[in-house]
Structure formats: C-alpha cells, structure tokens
Amino acid sequence: MAHAELATEQTLLREIGRTERNRRHIRGWLAVVLFALFALVLVGGATRLTESGLSITEWKPVHGVIPPLSAQEWEEEFRLYQRIPQYEQINKGMTVDDFKTIFWWEWAHRLLARGIGVIFALPLFFFWVTGRVERRLRLPLLAILALGGLQGFIGWWMVSSGLAERTAVSQYRLATHLTIACVIFAACMWIYRGLCPHSDDAPPTKASQKMAAVIAIFSLFQIYLGAIVAGLDAGLSYNTWPLMDGAIVPGGLFVQQPAWINLFENPKTVQFVHRLGAYLLLALVLWHMIAALRSAPETTHARRSVLLFALVVVQAAIGITTLLLQVPIGWGVLHQGGALVVLGFAIAHWRGFVGAYPKDTAIEVRA
C-alpha cells in the first residue's frame, strides 16, 4: 500500500511538473503574440495618422504579400490609387515617390497582420497535437483564432468604405476594426495572465474585484470612443484644455437630428464624450486604488491598483499633450499605444483577482 501511494505521489508530481512546463511554453508563445499585436496596433495608428490606409485599393490575402518590384508595377499600383476620391480630392498631383511612402505603411500593416496569423496558428497547432494545450484553453484559443480571421475581413470592409465616395474610411468601421483588435489583445492577455503564478493574497473585497472588471471593460469602451474621434478627426475640433471653446460644456453638441447621431457624427460631441470618458475612467481607478489600499494595503492587489492608476494618469497626460499639439503623428501613435497598455494591464489586474487557472492533477492509475 505504501509503495502504491508513493508511486501515485511521484506520478502526481511528474504530472504537475509537466503541466508547469507546458504552461511556460504557452506563456512564452502568448507573450510573443501580445508583443506582435501591440506592434500591429501602433503601425495601424501610424497608417491612419499618415492617411495611408487607402493606398492599397485591392485585397489580395496571398499575393498581396509581395509589393511592387519594378517601376512598371509601381506605376500600375499608383494608377489604381488615382482612381479613388482621396487622390482626386486630397492628394492630386502626388508623385510615385510620394505614393510609395503611404503605400509602405499600409503594406507593413497588412504584412504584420498576416504574420500574426501565422505566429498564432502554427504554434497553436503544434501545442495542440503534442498535448500541451489544456482542455479548458482549447475553445478560447480557437475563438481567438477565428476572431483573428474575421478581423482580416473587417479590415478590408473598413478600407472599402473609403474607395467609392468618401476620402477616408467610415468612423464606424474604423472603430469596429480597432475594437476587435483590442478584444483579441485582451483575450490573449487574459489567458496569459491566467497561466502565470499568482499570489495567495485574497481580494480586498468583492466590490474591488467587481470594480476591476468594470475598469477593464470601460477601458475597452474608451478605446472605442477614441476610434470614433480618430475616424472623424475630432481631435482637431478643440485644441484647448481643460476648457472647450472657453467653456466646460461647449455649444453645438446636439445640432444634428436625431440628437443621438451627434454622438457618432458630430466631431465636437465625439471629442467631448471622449474627454468625459477619460475623466470617468480616472475617477474609477482612483476610487478603486483608495478602496484597495484601505482594505488591504500590503497585498499585490493594492499594489497593482496603484500602478493602474499611475498608468491612467500618464495616458491622460499623453492625451492632453496630443490634443494641445493638434495631434502630431508621434504623439497620436503614443496615445494609441498608451491606451493598449492601460487595457492590457487592466485585464491582467482583473485576472489577478480571479486567480490562475487551476492545475489538472487528476491521475489515472492503471493496475
């Protein structure tokens, strides 16, 4: 009996060790995916700010990997761009060399997106067939893969909105594209954090745990609002702070009918709502930090809440600076990257309350 118990214990320890090794491999893979997704969002922001997103007017998922390689191919690509309203109304007179600048931004964005599909799908397949993917992770990882495929279609759906009548993409489709990218990033972060070792600190209160979830979800919503701002160039509506046109609440916020359409199509209203969202997020993380410090000042949860507050303050400062400088490209990209950092940490913070995935220690003992 003692020998059987010892053998079972040794088998259990080996199984736990194998699970931990597999988790380290999965974490390493997801860390690479997260880094690539972060880079993709930054390149996407630069593509938008340089008005490069409509430079490639066709969607070729496979052949589009190869850029123009000869002068003739560049001329042909440029002729395609000259057919769309953006060229006729904004960039008429652009040279081929000028066109190459905006082309490379969009091409790099698409290439990086394709690359992420590869670095997600191939390792997932390998980990799956070698038994390294825990059963509880299979459906979430497949859902992320499917969402990534859908995101490719959404990207082209967004671009196509600016090829016929508009000189820029639809703000609705831009917001959808960015939000889905952030959902994919958040989902990868949630799984990554769930596979990391956690502290044994109990959550300060149930309310703190719920507030961590609210903050994470609202951070994503604030990114959606920011995408609407970007799609309308609403960041140029008012370039003063803290007042807007000399007032806390400026006029002309609801001049369009029906009134709700102003929330999506009136640049002044859109910027005002995005500002309010930033103030509300700052208030939420401040309240959350104070509550955590009062309830359990020495816990990792409290320390994370302090860091989250600091990140939101820095992001707010970046946003204000971007606004006052009238949205220069560098600051605009930094602001978009900062939003993703806040979202990622908010997700990790929330997951810290929930805890790590339990390890499967069930051992089948055969006679």
Curated annotation (Swiss-Prot):
Entry keyword set: Cell membrane, Heme biosynthesis, Iron, Membrane, Metal-binding, Oxidoreductase, Transmembrane, Transmembrane helix
InterPro entries: COX15/CtaA_fam, Di-haem_cyt_TM, HemeA_Synthase_type2
Family: Belongs to the COX15/CtaA family. Type 2 subfamily.
Description of how the protein assembles with itself and partners: Interacts with CtaB.
SUPFAM superfamilies: Transmembrane di-heme cytochromes (SSF81342)
Origin species: Sinorhizobium medicae (strain WSM419) (Ensifer medicae)
Protein name in UniProt: Heme A synthase
Membrane topology: Multi-pass membrane protein
Keyword flag Cell membrane: yes
A GO term, aspect molecular function: oxidoreductase activity, acting on NAD(P)H, heme protein as acceptor
One Pfam family recorded for the sequence: COX15-CtaA
Sequence intervals crossing the membrane: 26-46, 111-131, 139-159, 174-194, 212-232, 272-292, 305-325, 327-347
